Regions:
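A conserved ligand/cofactor-binding region detector
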Residues: 1-797
Length: 797
């Protein structure tokens, strides 16, 4: 091994901790030694990096997100530190498979879907680009949940990831802080002015753990700060002795619940209350700590916005606005006007959805007793904002823009009012925000809104997930694209080169064979690697329309079985988690499994189509599926998907997009042109028009033989004793996301996919063009826009 120092560290750790040598150590011992050695190396780099930042005193960004879906860290760190090849060879010389060591590491249970993965991509990209940034979130003990499929139904179990995942974390006991809930607020006038005192509160200790973020071949090391909740005082013997049994352990109960699970079900008041506690807990801890550090360095907070950029990633961290106000007012003695000026110059907000149910609202009745001081500040912000709107002569907007309205606290409105910048995450999404969702706000703040299209960290999604493709591209066009993905456009000149196109398809076949093996081992289903791998992998939600995909599969089943269709063989691959309280999403998972079962039991049909549902979708599983995909299903109803990033990862790996003109699909379409993408369905204005005139799904049933035959078949379809008439009833009476309106167009697009796939040369060229034009979807480009246009931060030299 070239890096002798790194090798010696691993061997010393094994000897010191376990009394073993590298050739006699267990895989678990080798894993622990490797994780700990990397953590130590990153800590040393971090120290040097922080010393440089202390000299420059430059502005830093703080990215606040309820989730960070980081994926496994071990391979990512070895790749970024340029150690992977060395360690692989060193381990091989000692009879150890590095890939087997990788497989020991669990995915950290810190995120769920696209929001968390985007946050992690941005931390990676910012670090690789030498920008100073810290992420803030919660150290969830059990993650979101481990998904197990039992008889086609999703079941949720705790995800015990910390036992093996803890080796990458650094505990910072010097930076613990107190977070307060409940109690009452007393206001009084003193010699020093107006004072507010929070009394009879429940105190929770926030304990910090740092996950160090490496950059690609750089000395920059940033931090993801994760807070764990602990009871500050523990069991209260005095209260217990006085018969107040539940109150005696109240703090312990609150603390243990806060950092247990990501996104507890919010169908009850208890669940809603827990979500509020989680959000305030990590926001309060984070802002308290960074203000303390800033004040210790500068002796004032008046220059906070010159050195600190706070970012609200979706509405979950929106309480940062009143919390910063609380600290400035109550702890540091600033006037309201001065505190508000500092706050609004410090915060920026990214909106990630136009879905009404995802624009968080909390009832005053629930919120006020839980966070009395924060509520009083929100109330004052709302009062002053409403008066300002009236003074502008725009009082007609208040029904839409007021922060507190109809006894609800609207967190998106709080984020907009309290931030100096608001951005959407794709061109279409940002247009919808200013033209529709936040139209009234745009009228009030015409210069506040902008767009930053999402991006992905290609070093993980190509370099690590698909090393075969990455290595070939490096040989073909050079390795510039690893640092700067825009350079991948050099591949375009090979679009007509048969040898290159064939080689790319050979690599795709290798990845499909690898995935086929995994599918066989995981589900017992044998799939044909020469079939079209048609992939839809994302959170299960009605607007993402996994149901439309399933309807098409049932349509194909009928055509093959009864009408003599003999299509190009196709493997439909799904992976998705449904929120634990989302019954319709769970029903769709069951429906997909039942279709798979129906097909597997039919000797004729199973030769042509297969349906695979891979359980427990997470980053590591995505890294297996995405490089093997031929078709990328991005079929949300137009106007509903803010951006998406799975579409970008699949495009980069040569999958062809089958999608609506929604989210970032619009920009993928612009990048590759009409001939290298399969577009179908209604566009956003047509969806809006149909909604205005009243969408009637029955009309599509009556006018389309394909729809009628498919739905009639589903009504009679019974698999494992279960009938799916309720799916048909839902589609004919609600069809909230217009599956039937887009069905005929979708089937036609799928027929074009099948026809095109038979022309291997053309398909290969289309695949190449998608990879070659993925450069604009690099997270490096996205974070550059945030750094320059929103946060005003500079690279560390």
């Amino acid at each position: 091994m070239k890096n002798k120092r790194f090798k010696e560290k691993i061997e010393k750790y094994l000897k010191r901790q376990f009394g073993v040598t590298i050739d006699s150590a267990s895989k678990r011992q080798v894993y622990e030694a490797l994780m700990s050695t990397i953590r130590e190396d990153l800590s040393e780099k971090k120290f040097a990096y922080e010393q440089e930042l202390k000299k420059t005193r430059q502005k830093r960004a703080y990215y606040m997100s309820m989730e960070f879906l980081v994926g496994r860290t071990l391979r990512n760190n070895l790749f970024n530190l340029d150690l992977e090849k060395d360690v692989r060879e060193y381990f091989a010389d000692n009879g150890i498979s590095l890939d087997e060591i990788y497989d020991i590491e669990p995915d950290p249970g810190l995120g769920n879907g696209g929001l968390g993965r985007l946050a992690s991509c941005y931390l990676d990209a910012l670090t690789s680009s030498d920008y100073p940034v810290t992420g803030f979130s919660i150290l969830y003990e059990y993650g979101i949940f481990k998904q197990v499929i039992n008889n086609g139904w999703q079941q949720e179990f705790p995800d015990y990831w910390l036992d093996l995942g803890k080796y990458g974390l650094v505990y910072r006991n010097d930076e613990e802080v107190e977070v307060r809930f409940y109690g009452r607020v007393e206001e009084k006038l003193t010699e020093d002015g107006f004072k507010v005192e929070h009394k009879d509160y429940t105190s929770i200790q926030a304990e910090p753990y740092d996950l160090l973020i490496s950059g690609y071949k750089t000395g920059t090391v940033n931090t993801l700060r994760l807070w764990e909740a602990k009871a500050k005082t523990g069991f209260n013997m005095k209260l217990f002795e006085h018969g107040e049994y539940s109150k005696s352990s109240e703090a312990e109960a609150i603390a243990s619940s806060i950092s247990k699970l990501l996104y507890p079900a919010d169908s009850t008041n208890e669940g809603k209350e827990l979500r509020i506690k989680q959000q305030y807990f990590f926001i309060s801890a984070s802002i308290q700590q960074l203000l303390k550090n800033h004040y210790n360095e500068f002796g004032t907070l008046e220059n906070l916005f010159e050195h600190v950029a706070l970012h609200i990633n979706d509405t979950h961290p929106a309480m940062g606005v009143p919390e910063l106000m609380r600290l400035l007012l109550d702890e540091y003695g600033y006037s309201w006007d001065k505190a508000w000026d500092i706050t609004t110059k410090t915060f920026a907000y990214t909106n990630h959805t136009i879905m009404a149910e995802a624009l968080e609202k909390w009832s005053v009745e629930l919120f006020k007793p839980l966070l009395p001081r924060i509520y009083s500040i929100i109330e004052e912000i709302n009062k002053r904002f409403c008066q300002w709107v009236i003074d502008q002569g725009k009082d007609y907007t208040l029904a839409e823009t007021a922060i507190i309205y109809d006894n609800q606290i609207r967190m998106a409105n709080l984020s907009i009012v309290g931030s100096h910048n608001v951005n959407g995450v794709s061109k279409l999404h940002s247009d919808i925000l200013v033209d529709s969702t936040f139209r009234a706000f745009h009228e009030l703040y015409p210069t506040k809104f902008g767009n930053v299209t999402n991006g992905i960290t290609h070093r993980r999604w190509l370099g690590q997930a698909n090393p075969e493709l990455a290595e070939y591209l490096e040989d073909l066009i050079g390795d510039d694209f690893v640092k700067d993905l825009s350079k991948i456009d050099k591949l375009n000149k090979y679009a007509k080169d048969k040898k290159v196109v064939e080689k790319l398809q050979e690599i795709k076949k290798v990845k499909k064979e690898q995935l086929a093996k995994y599918i066989q081992e995981t589900t017992g289903i044998t799939v044909n690697p020469d079939s079209i791998f048609d992939v839809q992998v994302k959170r299960l939600h009605e607007y993402k329309r996994q149901l439309l995909n399933a309807l098409h599969i049932v349509y194909l089943y009928r055509e093959i079985k009864y009408n003599g269709l003999r299509p190009v063989p196709r493997t439909f691959i799904f992976a998705a988690k449904a929120s634990s309280g989302y019954q319709m999403a769970k029903n769709i998972i069951k429906f997909i499994h039942s279709i798979s079962q129906l097909i597997e039991s039919d000797e004729l049909v199973r030769d042509y189509i297969k349906v695979v549902f891979l359980p427990d979708y997470k980053v590591t599983l995505a890294e297996k599926i995405i490089p093997a995909a031929d078709i990328s299903e991005q079929i949300s109803q137009a106007g509903k998907e803010a951006s998406g990033t799975g579409n970008m990862k699949l495009m980069l790996n040569g999958a062809l997009t089958l999608g609506t003109l929604d989210g970032a699909n619009v920009e993928i379409h612009e990048a590759v042109g009409d001939d290298n993408i399969f577009i179908f369905g209604l566009e956003t204005p047509e969806v809006d028009e149909l909604n205005r005139h009243g969408y009637k799904p029955w009309e599509y049933y009556n006018s389309s033989a394909r729809i009628k035959d498919t739905l009639d078949f589903i009504r009679t379809m019974t698999v494992g004793g279960m009938n799916f008439s309720f799916i048909v009833d839902y589609l004919l009476t609600q069809d909230s996301y217009m599956c039937l309106a887009d069905f005929e167009s979708y089937v036609a697009a799928q027929e074009l996919v099948a026809k095109t796939y038979q022309d291997k040369e053309k398909w290969g060229q289309m695949s190449l063009i998608n990879t070659a034009n993925a450069g604009i979807f690099s997270a490096d480009r996205s974070v550059e826009e945030y750094a320059k246009d929103i946060w005003n931060i500079k690279k560390v030299k």
